[in-house]
């Protein structure tokens, strides 16, 4: 079962990277070797937008240390999302694209 969850999470991660790159962003993998609980990815979008993403297999929840780190990052004013479905990725990208239209006056 654990192997299937890892495969699902990897599939979601690949989709995230593809979609962020499609809109001109960069999706960096954060090594947690010395920083337990850090989100899996930091997404850098054109226009200076930054998003931290915790990737999970469908239905899985973040561990307590991850939730603690999410709170710390949010307290600094950054956005943190927990993603376990492709639909959530679509929603994040759509929100980013809408913000870009609004800020550039293209609406």
What residues fall within each predicted segment?
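Catalytic phosphate/metal-binding cores of nucleic-acid and nucleotide-processing enzymes, i.e., regions
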Residues: 1-107
């Amino acid at each position: 079962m654990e192997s299937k969850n890892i495969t699902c999470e990897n599939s979601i991660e690949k989709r995230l990277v593809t979609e962020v790159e499609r809109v001109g962003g960069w999706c960096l993998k954060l090594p947690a070797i010395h920083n337990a609980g850090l989100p899996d990815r930091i997404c850098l979008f054109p226009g200076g937008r930054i998003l931290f993403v915790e990737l999970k297999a469908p239905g899985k929840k973040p561990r307590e240390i991850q939730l603690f780190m999410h709170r710390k990052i949010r307290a600094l004013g950054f956005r943190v999302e927990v993603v376990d479905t492709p639909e959530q990725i679509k929603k994040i990208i759509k929100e980013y694209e809408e913000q870009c239209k609004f800020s550039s006056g293209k609406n």
